[in-house]
């Protein structure tokens, strides 16, 4: 960990020094859930978020049944549902040959047979607010981690900077939950295994009307693909383009983009006219990767910091939160008792690595067999035969909904 501090420099000796049991870096879904679950168990937790608020681009708004069940176990599903939200009960592929229902969440055996659509800033504020009920929880916004504190090969906390200058936060365990561009992953020198998804995404919103479908829809045709998710009064739209082609799309202009969208989904042509400025469109560079080891002494990575997910299936948030829940299950007792060791960190990786690698393998296959084919203008897109057969077999047709809704392994909150 060459980027970490091996000793405290003299200029920092006069800065603020604080102590916590667990320092969580990153106020995304994994970070806030882990902080809440540890705080509930009596562990002293400090959560550092680099930004001044929770409202940022590319934050998915999906909350899957697995997350809702987990929140229900700690009494938070009902109050969460009081926030303004929408529900997606089905996911369909709109192909040139007609619609194909990919996932019907209503068939799942759960109290929450849908994907909840809730602005992520509201979800994060809700969970952070619940964590703030515990006196052993502290949230620092606008706190940017600069360095790791390392002593004898063990991470003992971080040096961060906020509006008051640099400060030292010492901790028995530091958790990197700081997303796909993880600062802690970089500082810790973690090795990544990367893959190259064939696409990037243009991310924007257009008006939605009450008579519109309430599901998640994916449109295919003419070498183009558009995913639309119900956000209540708006559609959250993801226009899928070939990897590295965003400059050409922008150079062609907004008129060309609106025309391509209208050709793909003519019934929404009028809505696409609302796109009048490139500032309304954000580009998401799609990537997929995982670290070979999730931990080093005193340091653990979870969520996108440990495994960057492709947006296929929209499961990244679900997996990040399951990482957090499993980490809390394993770590709460040893942290509270002062008995944490490397074996506990290894156990977190053991429980969560195989579901992550499995879903990434599935995503890779879908990217190769479905999305790459859909983006080839020389081909007429057709749903692969094996996939159509799967959806027709009663015992198998619920599998896509289950994998999207719950992943390959359910995680429960340890009593």
Give each language-model segment a name.
Residues 64-130:
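Active-site-adjacent segment of FAD-dependent monooxygenases/related oxidoreductases
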Residues 285-301, 357-358, 375:
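FAD-binding beta-loop-beta segment adjacent to the flavin cofactor pocket
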Residues 141-155:
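A conserved short coil-to-beta-strand element within the FAD-binding core of flavoproteins
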Residues 2-9, 329-415:
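C-terminal helical "tail/cap" subdomain of flavin- and related membrane-associated enzymes
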Residues 225, 288-291, 306-318, 354:
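Glycine-rich phosphate/pyrophosphate-binding beta-alpha loops
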Residues 154-286, 290-291, 295:
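Conserved FAD-binding catalytic core of PHBH/FMO-like flavoproteins
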Residues 25, 39-59:
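Glycine-rich FAD pyrophosphate-binding loop
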Residues 13-30:
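Beta1/beta-strand and adjacent pyrophosphate-binding region of the FAD-binding site
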